[in-house]
Amino acid sequence: MNYNIYVCGVGGQGIIKTSVIIGEAAMKKDINVVMSEIHGMAQRGGSVSTEIRIGEVHGSIIPDGEADLVLAFEPLEAIRALPKMSEESEVILNTSVIPPFNLMRSPHPYPPLDEIMSTLEERAGSVRGFNAEEIALKAGHILSLNMVMLGAAAATPGFPLESESLISSMRDNLPSRLIDVNLRAFRDGFGAAAES
């Protein structure tokens, strides 16, 4: 089975760490996985995306229209991912907004969240949105937002990795002093996705 995951957001949200955790969880299960990453101006909240391809795939770039899952850490970044989506795609959207640096100086306002949601719903098969920032704060730290999103991915029908595999990879890749907060965030993200 092949499965394509497009992860997008802005610098500082833990996009790459999340992708490494997914990739290493797949490798531990002896599942072929390839990954590519694109860094924007991460120190200024620039766009960051990774493409994770699991299974018997050729190349690290997801062809347009072939993302099974789009894990969008920021709403406007989900719009940038539209070409990767199809009517079969699942989208998990963090609804908390981080206006891009260039938009703060632009006369064009940040699009309303309901417009972003409508655009995504027109393109993808399923869109589940929730405020992952609030969930991360309740779990104990804003920086656990990426684990909220990872938990939501694990709750997605058809996701090829079990929660136990992801948690094992989390333990290998996250500081031990923060593992409890991150585990809470993961479980709360799983619950939020299951409810949305």
Curated annotation (Swiss-Prot):
Its job: Catalyzes the ferredoxin-dependent oxidative decarboxylation of arylpyruvates.
GO MF annotation: an example: indolepyruvate ferredoxin oxidoreductase activity
EC number of this enzyme: 1.2.7.8
Protein name: Indolepyruvate oxidoreductase subunit IorB
Lyase in keyword set: no
Catalyses which reaction(s): indole-3-pyruvate + 2 oxidized [2Fe-2S]-[ferredoxin] + CoA = (indol-3-yl)acetyl-CoA + 2 reduced [2Fe-2S]-[ferredoxin] + CO2 + H(+)
Pfam family, one: POR
Natural source organism: Methanothermobacter thermautotrophicus (strain ATCC 29096 / DSM 1053 / JCM 10044 / NBRC 100330 / Delta H)
Subunit field text: Heterodimer of the IorA and IorB subunits.
Record key words, sorted: Oxidoreductase
